[in-house]
């Protein structure tokens, strides 16, 4: 029997029987040539090619022993680059466990083990990680304490304010791991891995007793130290809370003197402060914003305001020491607290204060005095305003609506809202402000004399870059070209780091969220430059040609996408710092994953192990969306779906969907005119969606959904819809294209494997050895005919429906819990809640309409389409009719369409009479009697369903038809039903 091809290429999924063959093949993707000629500049992929070159060109014979072997070379798709090394050398990993990549001195861990290690005096030349693996425990403990004290002193000197203002400093990942390693040793010799005294020695018992006594004393000492540290942390925390309350009281007095604010802002400021502090992991600039604000409030004296009244009005400005930028930041924090506390009217009031202060006072004031430091302060305020506006989707609120419930305000504040000016703002406006102003300021700071200023505030520009890249869909941020050559990680610029991903995946720090966000943002902008047709009409032609791409061509871009996914989507459940409930769900998912791998053919193991993971953060979903974008390069699909889902006018929805149908029929679904490349990217996006669709009821498994905002939920809905359309196109290719070699395509094989409930159907077709696998002898062989087409299509329908219902419920929960509620604390209805609730209602209705119409159109397209199935039903083949139906009935696709219509029986239907007429005419001209009869039966069923829905669910005859949402509001997303041949046969 031929050897199984279990070694899979990381870029094209081509299979090989030997690992060195796979390694050489992957070099053709990465253009890696590790064998260099010593006589010239030539390099080669294989060693024998170098030997032939030297023999024929230079007339010399190389000694084979001096050349590296294929096994000695590092495989860049298996062994990652370690960013902690300045030289970027590769580091080996063991069976999916990632090595700690950030030692205290920035050096690698030495993985070599020595049975008799000697204590070296050259401690300065080795890292702390090396010391801990070589020295006894007592020496380790004594050598690490001074280092920890020194690092803490350095942190206190660098951040003196943080020790007093309640902003905890996050220790490095290496510090946490090293502290954890101290508690894992049970004896002084456990780190050595050997016994210092032979077991047969007479002194062994004495030594063992001494070791046990020493261990007990050490454990007691560690417990005492741990208790002391806990008490110290609790004492500092109490001090920080008291200090934070004191500066909040000072802020209240400051705002009363500044603009006569008489609202109690203590609770809202604390709520907003804590929220921003929690978000500092994703946007690290928040930590500095809070630190500077607390420092200002801590050092500002209230008596300065009292002394102001002692001077005439002409001199008050010189003695008025209030920092307007910090006032704007304070307004933002207070507005954020009111939003989280379900008081949107109050939040908008303070948001408008901060916006008007920035736009009408601070920016014009900078234009007059031209203070360079004010530019950075402007960006701080504008970034925080933009974050709040987008995160809480304030575009759905009527920000200029006058409040008529004056009694809902506190005494003395009823007329304050009328004095505020109108604010004309939406998502596009605030993004344009941040995009333009950040580019202008960064361009001003690029001068040689002020270049240090932009480098010292580079973290601010990286955070702006992340935010703009996520929400601007058509083009990269204007600061993209400026930041390409700025240092991102140690000595790596953004360009150099991204180019490393085209040749190897990188061992990234699991806690460095900002680095991952920047990498995803850079990849997003690169794809915008490659695939977006729309460019700035005012941009000169010469500058368009000078746009700098990170990757030279699309093949290199494809390699980078594959390796970035492998670097960021790496998942190690044992290293995740999660709570017990989430850890239980993650362990359960790991069991499901291992069960799938163990029971699958060996040649599928590598693909399943690499690509099945849980998207735990929104940037994981962003990366999957970008991976899908490379497959579907037609961005018109994305724009059309976004327009249909976000419109608020019913007539526009119908009109847009008609255009969308034409786009699908004439362009997208025609794989011959618009082909797609079936490669590993298809598996990267499909595995998580298909596998997780069965476990969506495990609430703790998808905790990232609770942290998303409404705009992110919209993008996620579009991603699932676009993936579903891609799967429909792939389904057509598999069943129609005779050039597809399914028996040698591991991508399509594994896709069918995880879809089918009865895996034996696929194994029987591929003639795979099933001696070690669960196998059903009586199963039907998978065939590319009508019946199996509808079986797989219904399976995709079920997965799509589960995900859409799951996202709908999650979006409703997030909106109701984190943004606004029906009533305020005073009992008065929040008027802005109606706007937000109406927006969510329109979105849910649009999604429901779109799902139903899409499913209806696709079923009609597959029945009336001109594509032919690769295989026809063979009446003489017993495998195709074992326990099913006879050829005379042939209602396979009819049953499938009826079942598909039943899935969405509660959805509104889009009536299009002209399409039904064409549909009937096509049936009259079809020579196949069985198809014509079956289609007519299904059409009557559709018509009955349409009349039932229109009578029961629609209210009114206007374009703003409102669906009776209560009928399917509580429908839970269910596990994918088993759509097997037996079930399909029973329905006939």
Swiss-Prot record:
GO terms for biological process: cell adhesion; positive regulation of cell adhesion involved in single-species biofilm formation; positive regulation of cell-substrate adhesion; regulation of transcription by RNA polymerase II; single-species biofilm formation on inanimate substrate. SUPFAM superfamilies: beta-beta-alpha zinc fingers. Disruption phenotype: Decreases cell adherence to silicone substrate. Keywords: Cell adhesion, Metal-binding, Nucleus, Repeat, Transcription, Transcription regulation, Zinc, Zinc-finger. A zinc finger (C2H2-type) spans 7-29, 35-59. The keyword Transcription applies. It is found in: Nucleus. Residues 84-106 have a biased composition (Low complexity). GO terms for cellular component: chromatin; nucleus. Transcription factor required for yeast cell adherence to silicone substrate. This is Transcriptional regulator of yeast form adherence 5. It comes from Candida albicans (strain SC5314 / ATCC MYA-2876). The lineage of its organism: Eukaryota, Fungi, Dikarya, Ascomycota, Saccharomycotina. The gene is TRY5.
